[in-house]
Structures are given as C-alpha cells and as structure tokens.
A protein has these predicted regions:
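An N-terminal hydrophobic leader/cap segment in hydrolases
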Residues: 4-63, 69-73
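The serine-hydrolase catalytic nucleophile loop
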Residues: 89-101, 287
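Catalytic nucleophile-loop/oxyanion-hole region of alpha/beta-hydrolase
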Residues: 90-93, 120-154
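Conserved alpha/beta-hydrolase
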Residues: 100-124
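Active-site nucleophile loop of the alpha/beta-hydrolase fold
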Residues: 184-194
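Short beta-strand/loop motif that positions the catalytic acidic residue
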Residues: 269, 275-277
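Conserved alpha/beta-hydrolase "acid-adjacent" motif
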Residues: 282-288
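Catalytic histidine-centered segment of alpha/beta-hydrolase-like enzymes
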Residues: 307-317
Length: 328
C-alpha cells in the first residue's frame, strides 16, 4: 500500500511538473508576429473614405468601479431608445460616427460609443486591461450611467467585430445587465474554433501557442503572465494615427470574445438579438452565422449583399437596415 501511494505521489508530482513546464514553455517561448502595415485585408478603403466627412463629438468621461475614467462619444436625439455601440479590435469609437450620426439624426436612437479600456487616444495602458472580465464590468458601469440618464428609454447594446463577441460574452454570462432590452451584433467575432472563423483573413496574427499555454496556467489559477501579448493586427500604415491599438494582451483578448463554450453564451442571450453580416466579409465566414446562432430562438440573422466587414457599419444601406430593426 505504501509503495502504491509513493508511486502515485511521484506520478502526480511528475505530471504537475510536466503540465507547468508545457504551460510556461508555450507562454514564454513563443512570440506574437509584428503587425504588418502593408496588409489590406478588410477593405480599409471604406474606412478611409468614411473618415473624411465625419462629424465626431468630443470624448466625455465616466468613472468605472475601479475609480478610473473611461470615455465615450454621445449622439443625442429625442428618441425613446438608447444604443450603446462598441467598436471592433485595433481602433476606437471614431469610425462608428457615421452610423451613430444616422441613428441620432433620423430620430431612431440616442447613441453612446465608448472607447473600451486599453483603446483610443486617452488610454493609459494601450492594449491591456487589469484582469479578464474587466471589459464586461466597464460596459455594465456605462449601462448603469445610461439607465440613470434615460430612465424611460429602451437600452440596446451593440458591438462590431470583436466587440460583437464581447457583447455576447457579457450578455450570455453572469455579468449581463438586467436593464438591457436588445442586442445588435454587426459582423461579430465568435471564437477561433467557431465555423464563422476564417483562417486566411490576414487581419490578425494570433499566437495560438501562447494562448494555449496561458489557458493551461489560468486553469490552475496562475495568472501572472496574462499581461503578455497574444495577438496583433495588420492595420495599414496610411490609416494609423497613433490612436490605434496594434496588439492585445492575453487578458484583453480573452475578454473580447465569448467563452470557449461559445454556444452556451449565445444560447443564454435571452433578449432580442439582431445579427448583421456582409456577404463579402473578408474576416469571417458569413454563411455560417445561421448555424452558430441556431440554438437561440431570439436571434435574427440578416446577410447583406455586397457588404464587407466595415460595410455593415459604414454603408448607408446598413444604416437603414439597422434603423428598421430598431424601430420594430
């Protein structure tokens, strides 16, 4: 019996050492590819043309639960709906101005477009947050502010691209806010293992070895390496203006998409959900969204002909489609 226990102890210790060795090895001895300024993977020409004629409000601050200031842009209207619309990876709220101006100008909704922590011109720690889940907390704090300011309005939370994923994560988990009525997902990122993922988009350089290693360490409560970069973004040089965010830490990247059981996060979204995807999206597999959302009876999927990844945010037709859904 003693011999058996001794052998079991040795095997257990050896397995633990091997597990830690693999976790630390994958985390520390792999690197994230440097972002390229030459790639043109997701039709940035639309973004260039859009920003030439933008009317963009100044950033305003709000205080989050950790006492720090985060920022948003505010588009006022007389509507009884408020949309909180969150930007995608790599940039910030500025590129959402055309959609926000349309919704507010047409009297469809008042719009708030936050710069997520780690993003935008005012961030103190670009590409990083303090811990996994802090993005959800910040969004909840903004939602509470909006509810206080607009107590009789419907609240819709929306996100484009990676922040569509962040919205799913928040809505499908324990941090969902009870005041939210509906969700708007514009070409949302789901998960690297979801059928919507496209391997050849050339937009992101994800270090899967590091992601796996850090995931292994996090599963046993080791989080002190979560500040390490896990992904970078190939944003063309001519659209960079020193307010972009070209790399994410592991803890920020994890916070920007649904959990590994992404089907469960989607299923648990118990409000009305509208998913808009362009048939010509260069980043995701547009024809797979129906399958990914099939277990949520509240979800409506709309595929726009001739629309690209940015097109679902920037095209006037997309603005009208979104407005029509909001007015239902």
């Amino acid at each position: 019996m003693k011999k058996f226990l001794k052998i079991s102890l040795i095997v257990g210790i050896s397995s633990g050492v091997i597990y830690l060795g693999i976790g630390y090895g994958l985390s520390l001895f792999s690197t994230v590819e440097k972002p390229s300024g030459q790639e043109e993977s997701i039709a940035f020409d639309k973004l260039r043309n859009n920003e030439q004629n933008l009317s963009v409000p100044s950033l305003e601050g709000y205080q989050t639960r950790d006492g720090t200031d985060q920022y948003y842009r505010y588009y006022e209207s007389e509507a009884d709906k408020v949309v909180i619309l969150v930007h995608g990876s790599g940039y910030h709220s500025k590129y959402l101005a055309s959609l926000a101006n349309y919704l507010s100008g047409e009297g469809v909704a008042t719009v708030y477009t936050p710069d997520l922590r780690g993003h935008g011109p005012n961030t103190e720690n670009r590409g990083d947050i303090d811990y996994i889940g802090q993005i959800e907390e910040d969004l909840n704090d903004l939602i509470s502010l909006v509810v206080d300011r607009h107590p009789d309005s419907s609240i819709i939370v929306g996100g484009h691209s990676s922040c569509g994923g962040a919205v799913i994560r928040m809505a499908g988990g324990s941090s969902h806010h009870e005041a939210v009525d509906d969700y708007l997902l514009l070409a949302p990122y789901i998960h690297h293992e979801a059928p919507t993922n496209a391997e050849d988009s050339n937009w992101a350089n994800e270090n899967l070895q590091r992601m796996i290693g850090l995931s292994m360490l996090n599963q046993i409560g080791i989080t002190h390496l979560n500040h390490l970069d896990a992904i970078s973004f190939n944003m063309p040089n001519d659209v960079r203006d020193n307010t972009e965010t070209l790399a994410y830490s592991y803890r920020l990247q994890i916070s920007m998409h649904p959990r590994d059981e992404y089907e469960q996060d989607i299923e648990f979204m118990d409000n009305r959900v509208f998913v808009l995807i362009g048939r010509e999206d260069q980043t995701f597999q547009a024809n797979q969204y129906e399958e990914v959302f099939h277990n949520n009876e509240n979800a409506k999927i709309r595929m726009m002909e001739d629309a690209t990844h940015f097109g679902v945010v920037l095209d006037e037709k997309a603005h009208r489609v979104i407005a029509e859904w909001l007015e239902l």
